[in-house]
């Protein structure tokens, strides 16, 4: 009986989520900046910076890598690592599919952006990502 309970606990804890694919990450980068280090600009109440147009809250949620949000956002390795950390953190908590569409909608619409109840806010963004060759 104890073995059965332990097996059930271990089995239910072993759900595995993969990380955002390199191709999907590249499509998001292309949409956000043409995949270039473009510095920061004011965008809807706050600065958006770098390759992925990362905002302060996003950078904090991804673990605040690098020396500052601005320097991380303009360094492709740091910025892509931040995006991966953000996605890895939120995909397992929001019940969304492990797909490029979910990741793109989360990047644009926040942690809940991939939920169907929020799709209306991220539909245009998802179409832009698809136009870069991702599905």
Swiss-Prot record:
It is found in: Secreted. This is Lysozyme 2. Optimum temperature is 55 degrees Celsius. No decrease in activity was detected after incubation at 30 degrees Celsius for 30 minutes. No activity could be detected after incubation at 90 degrees Celsius for 30 minutes or 100 degrees Celsius for 10 minutes. Keywords: Antibiotic, Antimicrobial, Bacteriolytic enzyme, Disulfide bond, Glycosidase, Hydrolase, Secreted, Signal. Belongs to the glycosyl hydrolase 22 family. Type-I lysozyme subfamily. Expressed in the epithelia of the basophil cells in the digestive tubules, but not in the epithelial cells lining the digestive ducts and stomach. Expressed at a much lower level in the style sac-midgut tissues. No expression detected in mantle, gills, labial palps or hemocytes. GO terms for cellular component: extracellular region. Transmembrane segments: none annotated. Activity decreased by 80% by addition of 0.01 M calcium, zinc or magnesium. Activity only decreased by 17% by addition of ammonium, and by 2% by addition of sodium. Retains more than 90% of its maximum activity between pH 5.4 and 6.4 in the ionic strength range of I=0.005-0.01. In buffers of I=0.005 more than 75% of maximum activity is retained between pH 5.3 and 7.5. In buffers of I=0.02 more than 75% of maximum activity is retained between pH 5.3 and 6.5. It catalyses: Hydrolysis of (1->4)-beta-linkages between N-acetylmuramic acid and N-acetyl-D-glucosamine residues in a peptidoglycan and between N-acetyl-D-glucosamine residues in chitodextrins. It holds the Pfam family Destabilase. The gene is lysoz2.
């Amino acid at each position: 009986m104890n073995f059965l309970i332990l097996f059930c606990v271990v089995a239910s804890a072993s759900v595995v989520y993969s990380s955002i694919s390199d191709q999907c990450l590249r499509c998001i980068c292309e949409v956000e900046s043409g995949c270039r280090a473009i510095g920061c600009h004011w965008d809807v109440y706050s600065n958006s910076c770098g390759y992925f147009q990362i905002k302060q809250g996003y950078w904090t949620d991804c673990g605040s890598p690098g020396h500052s949000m601005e320097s991380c956002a303009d360094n492709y390795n740091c910025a892509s690592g931040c995006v991966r950390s953000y996605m890895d953190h939120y995909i397992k908590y929001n019940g969304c599919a492990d797909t490029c569409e979910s990741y793109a909608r989360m990047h644009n619409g926040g942690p809940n952006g991939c939920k169907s109840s929020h799709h209306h806010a991220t539909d245009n963004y998802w179409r832009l990502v698809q136009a870069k060759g991702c599905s």
